[in-house]
Amino acid sequence: MNKNGIPRRKLLDFAALIAATGLSLLAFAQFSQAQIPASSGSALQAASSKTSAEKAYQFQNTMMDAYASGSTVRLAQSYSDQALGATAFTYDNAVAIDAYLLRESHDDVARAEVLGNGLIYAQATNFPFNDGRFAQAYFVNTLAPDGSGAYITPAGFPFYFYGSAVGDQAWAGMALAQLYRRTHQQQYLTAALKVANWIVANTYNTLGPGGYSFGSVINQFNQSVPSPNGKSTEHNIDTYAFFSMLAEITHNGNAANGASWSSLAQHALDFVLAMYNPAGGYFYTGTLGDQVTINPFPIPEDCQDWSYLALLNNNYANTIDWALANLQTTDTAASPHSSLTGSEKITGIVFDTASLSTNPAAYPFADPTAVWLEGTAHSVAALIARIMVGRGSPSRFKDLETVEFFVNNSETAQSEFGAGQTVNGMPIPVGEGLVASTSVMDTGFGYTYGPSLHIGATGWYLIGLQGGNPFQLGYRSLRP
């Protein structure tokens, strides 16, 4: 058994599968670390992926060290300066922690701990409430005024990213739980339990199929009020995975309200399964604001791929195929408002069904064929998980081919996008990070993505390349 807990027999099966299809992935090399011989063509592909991963990690380091370095408590800026300035999104930093912990070098683990300490500081000093929640984002370009030496301050004007969506809380909690498992440092578990208890106390919902509501927003009077949004399938997937981790770490311990973490995880799962459309083979996005009525449009990618990563249940494996069939696109220079030029073309996944039919009145410069590189990496991770869980399935060969195809397209995007972008005014080398999307992309939820270098997209690319699963404690899609 290797250090990730994957039985060597299963690794050898995966190696044989790769050899049979003529493919080679950094994912397998990172999983096994067994240096199993491959064909010369496969070896070249593996070397390319390894180089791509090393460059991607360098981008993550650049973004993390833009304003401070070493052990200074901080979070990493999410996008290049050209997008949202020195803003660090809580979710993006959780993904960055996962990517660092997956590679497991001494420096990577140290960086994950620094970001984890940043989350702990952000939680303890969160404005305007420090009751265990995290804000959506923070500013990371100035010293905090409290003398702590941390580079984390509230993300006020002009964005006011003070709200606390349940998905962001769960992602921060999962990253902290993973840090606790890796380091056994109590402060990470303490912070994870604080945010978990905030979720339970503030969003546990009994309307309709139950689950957890969207979260809280901060109004103009700096008061915390429930979000008017409907319940989110994605948020409940995240919460199910997070509370399942806590059940394992605490040996099925209880939340502050006395309920077991496993029962609280089941409450989220009940909602998720109620959102499944068996006729269509996909999960709905969630409910409308009444917390009961299913919201039929748009249908997002993350619910399809993340549900499999969280559940590892082949009864719902077809949701991956639904996303591939209905959310795959190719961005070319001929596409409306594309940022591509010449003969460039990138194939991958979009955010949701609304992305393919953009609203010209709201977003006149959106490209209906823009590729969401983070979502493409979600699909890579889900496909690798399906290969590992259902290794006897004939579809594993097709899944591997799709993985290699998406990885190749992502490597192309990595090498060609992001020229002229900066962090803290300093140029970011071309060919390291991945942009959020190849062109401006309408999500259908009132915001867009664009071709700005992004630690979230890059972090998920690294997770996918290494076959990681952040919804499972220890990142394993297989249990020993």
Task: Give names to the regions the model predicted.
Residues A99-H106, Q304-D305, L311:
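Alpha-helical support elements that line or immediately flank enzyme active sites
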